[in-house]
């Protein structure tokens, strides 16, 4: 099972680039550490555009899972909450529609720029870890494993 590498796609928002480009670097590095292959990196203007890119990647046969990366920084209005909540809902729906894992590596809502900088490593690596683990476990279940406690 683990001989066959998990192939993942990464969707990263360019908005708040000082944060998201570091998230992308950490995510790619962690994927290599987990022996997962990054097949595609799809850069989108902002977090709002992430679901469409996720849908495109999930439709590909060479993608087992998708990692989303972004930073939704708190502003003067509730715009950050609306964006983050809608994106989370849509990527979750896409995961169910395509029966492939999609992890949420989006910092926010409500995060300050300083908080987002502090969370780069955690959010990036956890998102990759989650997607790869789920893809491996789903692959094992599809191959006939009777255990739900698959490592």
UniProtKB/Swiss-Prot annotation:
Q: Which InterPro entries match?
A: LS (IPR034964), LS/RS (IPR002180), LS/RS_sf (IPR036467)
User: What keywords does the record list, in alphabetical order?
Assistant: Riboflavin biosynthesis, Transferase
Annotated positions binding 5-amino-6-(D-ribitylamino)uracil: 15, 47-49, 71-73, 104
Q: In which pathway does it act?
A: Cofactor biosynthesis; riboflavin biosynthesis; riboflavin from 2-hydroxy-3-oxobutyl phosphate and 5-amino-6-(D-ribitylamino)uracil: step 1/2
> What class does this enzyme belong to in the EC scheme?
transferase
Q: What is its EC number?
A: 2.5.1.78
Protein name, UniProt field? 6,7-dimethyl-8-ribityllumazine synthase
Q: Which organism is it from?
A: Metallosphaera sedula (strain ATCC 51363 / DSM 5348 / JCM 9185 / NBRC 15509 / TH2)
Q: What is the lineage of its organism?
A: Archaea, Thermoproteota, Thermoprotei, Sulfolobales, Sulfolobaceae
Gene name of this polypeptide: ribH
């Amino acid at each position: 099972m683990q001989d066959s590498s998990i192939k993942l796609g990464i969707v990263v928002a360019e908005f708040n680039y000082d944060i998201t480009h570091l998230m992308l670097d950490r995510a790619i590095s962690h994927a290599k550490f987990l022996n997962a292959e990054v097949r595609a990196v799809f850069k989108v203007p902002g977090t709002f555009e992430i679901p469409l890119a996720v849908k495109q990647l999930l439709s590909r046969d060479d993608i087992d899972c998708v990692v989303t990366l972004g930073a939704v920084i708190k502003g003067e209005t509730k715009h950050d909450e609306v964006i983050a909540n809608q994106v989370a809902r849509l990527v979750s729906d896409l995961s169910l529609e395509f029966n492939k894992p999609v992890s949420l590596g989006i910092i926010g809502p409500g995060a300050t720029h300083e908080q987002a900088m502090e969370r780069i490593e955690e959010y990036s690596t956890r998102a990759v870890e989650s997607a790869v683990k789920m893809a491996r476990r789903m692959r094992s279940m599809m191959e006939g494993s009777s255990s739900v406690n698959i490592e």
